[in-house]
Structure formats: C-alpha cells, structure tokens
C-alpha cells in the first residue's frame, strides 16, 4: 500500500516525508483555504513547493464544474510539474474531462466518490486514481470501508488499472481497515500515519529493555 498525506501544510508534508514512507500528497480547495492560500498564482506556487518536497504524485483539484473549465484548469495544472495529478469531481462533466485527459496522457484522480457506480464510470473513463470517501460515508451511517472493498473487488474482476485511493480517513483504524480491504493507496492526516507506530506493548517493552540495560551498565 502507498501512503499519501492529505494536507496542504508544508510543515506536515515535510515531517511525513522525513519518516521515509510517504508516497504522495492530496490537496483540495478546502485544505488550501485552511492554509490561507488564495488566488490562482499563489495556489500554483504552493503546488510547486509541495512537488519540491515530495517525489511522488501530488493531486491538485480543479475548481471549475463545467467541462471546458475543467479541461483548461487541468491542462494548466498538469503543465506545472510531471508529478501533478489532476483531481476531478465525480460529476458528468468530470467523467468527460477524465476521458479527455486520459487521451492526452494527463493523469487524474476522480474525487468525491461514494458509490460503486461512480467508481465504475471513473475507471471506464481511464482515471488513474479513484477516491472513495470513507469517513464521510461513516458520518451518514453508511459503511465507507465496505465501499472500498467492493470497488477493489470490481476493479480486480474487470482488470481495471485504476488505483483505489481511500480518502476521508479519520483514524489509524481506518488505515488498517483500508489495508484489509485491499486499497492501493490511503491518503491520511499526519496524526493517523504516526498513529500506526503506537502500541502499548512497544512502549512497555522498550521501557523494560532500557531498565534492564541500566541495571547491568549503571
């Protein structure tokens, strides 16, 4: 499984990258706004800064909701850096845009996916990644992990190349469940990634080892 960090915060991206296990970054307009990054030029400079930190894919989302606007924005974003993946919402114009980008050799991440049907259309259009939103489905008493599992099974059965990028991950437990469901990628907050390191037996075992060492070595 690949790990992406879901943030536009450069310090968090650097910290995750220093762990040595980071494969990429996902961003969205809300995350960019949270960091106070406004205006097209500032956003694009920020994407380039992210690409300088991380060697893997960086998802940059279009703002337009019409086909012509998506194509224009997507081509401009893709031209910024080879690692940019154009993030497109799973709406009718988005599927058409993904098909266009596929023909042009531009990689895409189909986002805001909440059903198997949406994931099917994204794969048929040639999306590089599809992003089912685990946490948001859980918020409405649906089963986000089960959706990930069903999409993985469908892609395996029909031999689609689209990678399942589990998104809206809220916890370390979500990551483990996505691993068990067979997701190709999990995009997570830094806290969830670091949470994978934590286990009480690791802490107690280390404390015992250090105490025993001090007994012998003073």
UniProtKB/Swiss-Prot annotation:
Keywords: Cytoplasm, Pentose shunt, Schiff base, Transferase. It catalyses: D-sedoheptulose 7-phosphate + D-glyceraldehyde 3-phosphate = D-erythrose 4-phosphate + beta-D-fructose 6-phosphate. One of its GO terms (biological process) is carbohydrate metabolic process. GO terms for molecular function: aldehyde-lyase activity; transaldolase activity. It holds the Pfam family TAL_FSA. Gene3D superfamilies: Aldolase class I. InterPro entries: Aldolase_TIM, TAL/FSA, Transaldolase_3B, Transaldolase_3B/F6P_aldolase, Transaldolase_AS, TSA/FSA_arc/bac. GO terms for cellular component: cytoplasm. CDD domains: Transaldolase_FSA. It comes from the Bacteria. Its main location: cytoplasm. The keyword Transmembrane does not apply. Transmembrane segments: none annotated. The active site is at 87 (schiff-base intermediate with substrate). It is found in: Cytoplasm. Its EC number is 2.2.1.2. Pathway: Carbohydrate degradation; pentose phosphate pathway; D-glyceraldehyde 3-phosphate and beta-D-fructose 6-phosphate from D-ribose 5-phosphate and D-xylulose 5-phosphate (non-oxidative stage): step 2/3. The keyword Transferase applies. PANTHER family: FRUCTOSE-6-PHOSPHATE ALDOLASE 1-RELATED (PTHR10683:SF40), TRANSALDOLASE (PTHR10683). Belongs to the transaldolase family. Type 3B subfamily. Transaldolase is important for the balance of metabolites in the pentose-phosphate pathway. NCBIfam families: fsa_talC_mipB (TIGR00875). This is Probable transaldolase. It comes from Parabacteroides distasonis (strain ATCC 8503 / DSM 20701 / CIP 104284 / JCM 5825 / NCTC 11152). The lineage of its organism: Bacteria, Pseudomonadati, Bacteroidota, Bacteroidia, Bacteroidales.
